[in-house]
Amino acid sequence: MKLSSACAIALLAAQAAGASIKHRINGFTLTEHSDPAKRELLQKYVTWDDKSLFINGERIMIFSGEFHPFRLPVKELQLDIFQKVKALGFNCVSFYVDWALVEGKPGEYRADGIFDLEPFFDAASEAGIYLLARPGPYINAESSGGGFPGWLQRVNGTLRSSDKAYLDATDNYVSHVAATIAKYQITNGGPIILYQPENEYTSGCSGVEFPDPVYMQYVEDQARNAGVVIPLINNDASASGNNAPGTGKGAVDIYGHDSYPLGFDCANPTVWPSGDLPTNFRTLHLEQSPTTPYAIVEFQGGSYDPWGGPGFAACSELLNNEFERVFYKNDFSFQIAIMNLYMIFGGTNWGNLGYPNGYTSYDYGSAVTESRNITREKYSELKLLGNFAKVSPGYLTASPGNLTTSGYADTTDLTVTPLLGNSTGSFFVVRHSDYSSEESTSYKLRLPTSAGSVTIPQLGGTLTLNGRDSKIHVTDHNVSGTNIIYSTAEVFTWKKFADGKVLVLYGGAGEHHELAISTKSNVTVIEGSESGISSKQTSSSVVVGWDVSTTRRIIQVGDLKILLLDRNSAYNYWVPQLATDGTSPGFSTPEKVASSIIVKAGYLVRTAYLKGSGLYLTADFNATTSVEVIGVPSTAKNLFINGDKTSHTVDKNGIWSATVDYNAPDISLPSLKDLDWKYVDTLPEIQSSYDDSLWPAADLKQTKNTLRSLTTPTSLYSSDYGFHTGYLLYRGHFTATGNESTFAIDTQGGSAFGSSVWLNGTYLGSWTGLYANSDYNATYNLPQLQAGKTYVITVVIDNMGLEENWTVGEDLMKSPRGISTSCLPDGQAAPISWKLTGNLGGEDYEDKVRGPLNEGGLYAERQGFHQPEPPSQNWKSSSPLEGLSEAGIGFYSASFDLDLPKDGMSHCSSTSVTALRHPRTACRSTSTDIVCEIHKQHRTSDQLPCPRGNPELSRNELVGGDPVALDSAGGKLESLELSYTTPVLTALGEVESVDQPKYKKRKGAY
């Protein structure tokens, strides 16, 4: 926003005095920074008042969804998600950056290949999506260590505090990632409009300064020093007011908070507990940050699912379309202006990046599934709300009132919250007073309008609010100069075209609705039956009532066409911005929104653009689909769908119609059980001939871990030796006295971890894991040992990831992995000399392409056999379906031809493991570099996505697996197969294979 010179002089004068600047433009209070350099940049690009953000001087509501690039590291597929978000009517995506993936070794920042953020930013720009950058350094995110690299366990200072050792440890990462973000912020023509320093900085232990203004200011200064000039926003984990503007040092520019009102009990997806619907957020906002727009930086879009949980299908049921209607519209009642849903797309926890309490899938029950499908009804419901927000600018300038059970509705069973506008229209959010009610309630409304106070319906009958539903009724809604005095049906969108205006309204099945329009024109039904439609003309308006039908009706009132739809029909409509200069829709601006067209096209419409006399649509189809286009510019004569010229007809209302045929491809998937499987023992460490001379010695007398002191003669904490991820192996050498009868050990691997112990080649036993246990103390009986003879104890520990660091001062991220105690407890027992290993090289990890977390310490991993084309020619022939006959770990490999048609079909293939004979396994698909943990006694997910972008997708695929048998009887997979969902004819285009180097003999591998 540009200021007059007089205003600028006043600002500079106040700035010189160190004051915060406030001024009024067009009746709104704007807040400017006291820092002149920052203010100079922001005044043109991103500013705000107490109502909303302004981008380039234009008021805008930020409607956003969370999506993490590291959970879908394929550029073209990132564009796919951005386009699906754009199609919702959203204009923004929020993203985390996982520090652990880009600085696996202190001082070495590597953000290339799949970890390069710039293609992610470019894809956002191509889709016309703004970005909210959230690089941490702490992110939580159900990620290992909350995004902290494992080497922070050695930092001599409290994490997320002003301790110098911790701050110094963050400098390299933040300076690099913030500089990249600065390069792509809006001031440089990029998509990034907001920056969040820290994450959920909300709770601290007693004895620790919290909140620490010095710490928070340091994190903010790190970003500013790297060139970040866009506004800083925070996300208090609850509406507590921490670091809000005006709180002093460490205050952010815009205060935001999180909210997950239904919690995470997916096991009871139909239960909405009493009292969980927020009702005081507006009051808290006015108390905590009245000068900034109301922001919820994380509002519940799904749920995580723990080991043994009911699965993400249940989570998507708990947080379904009904939840969205009730809870998201409730947020609108608070005049939310920055709303980000966590998650919009969850993705996958590739290669050990997840935290201990979760598994491979991070589907999150979100609107877009892990396999990138948009078949959940909650996606379509979001589209209705997102598009309504785009065409309701008066919402942002209205004045929210208090909720009430009297004054608007004629029954106390309903609660109404008004947002009253002057000349910009008003909004009335209606819900059940018992928000979880599944009853249908009949009601009438009395609403203030420009035509006076009106009792609705005027033409007789009643309105209906069905169970677990909510509505936003509008009054004096401006449809490009036509005043909608009121509408009880909800607004999907409206547009002004050269030949008139179009308004799209929808209602639920079985409902009756009514609207009134300021006009002297008559009502004409121009499509569909007149049955169930009534109207009445007054001196200055016309009132229309109708019963919702599954068949579309169109009525004409003057130059306004009104489409009357049921909700399920409205799901099939899309409102793409119409590009006239190139193919990209561009960012959402009032001009771009106004230029949109309306398309009925089923599964997905990605983009629309004009080129010469052609109207080009890019769209996805999962069935033969009738396509209709409303508002085609007069310059367009031909229709192209996905690049193909498509014949079309034009009806009397100017609607273009065409049909896209869908022919399901003939897909023949190979039978995995019939492949020529090769096997290699991946636990050679228990063989008598095994040489561990190259292993690091666990000989540190002290630990650098400040959370837990040593209870062993030397440190057996893996992070002290640079091993932070995946399987850990220990070999303890001792010379027997002959008195030893038992071996006691306490292993730590995180929630649901497992461990196994051998003496030489003799299996002693295993801990198969429980969700509630992150460590386990076991005592194993020993056979009679021969005095003077050397023995080796081999311990395998499944490291499930590092703990998150939610509460400042607890330093739970430093919870060690490995062995906390071990001994031969008998009186004259010999001491044990330990060696250990994790991934080859530890922090000097071997595979720079796949990153520092991808590999663990199993023999096959250290050798690189999990990579494509391992040297399996001379391996034993054996299948994971045959498995192991005794406790151990095997690695299985097979190749096959995957011949998929290259006709634009997206197949969303998956690997499905349906059952296990024995309790635990791990498997790895080398083509996707996914590590999955499947535990029989707390198994939740048994399907793994195979996204496009995998190398050699249409030629040789390689599947590798490490079944871990924690039972003396061995173990095997009961079933292993490839499957696919309904193929989608997609306009996404070619997906380039990400770099996946093949096997190469590793120097120094042991």
Curated annotation (Swiss-Prot):
The entry's keywords: Glycoprotein, Glycosidase, Hydrolase, Pharmaceutical, Signal
Native organism: Aspergillus niger
Keyword ATP-binding in annotation: no
Similarity annotation: Belongs to the glycosyl hydrolase 35 family.
Glycosylation sites: 156, 373, 402, 422, 478, 522, 622, 739, 760, 777, 805
GO terms, molecular function: beta-galactosidase activity
Catalytic activity: Hydrolysis of terminal non-reducing beta-D-galactose residues in beta-D-galactosides
Protein known as: Beta-galactosidase
Listed Gene3D superfamilies: Beta-galactosidase, domain 2, Beta-galactosidase, domain 3, Galactose-binding domain-like, Glycosidases
Catalytic activity, EC: 3.2.1.23
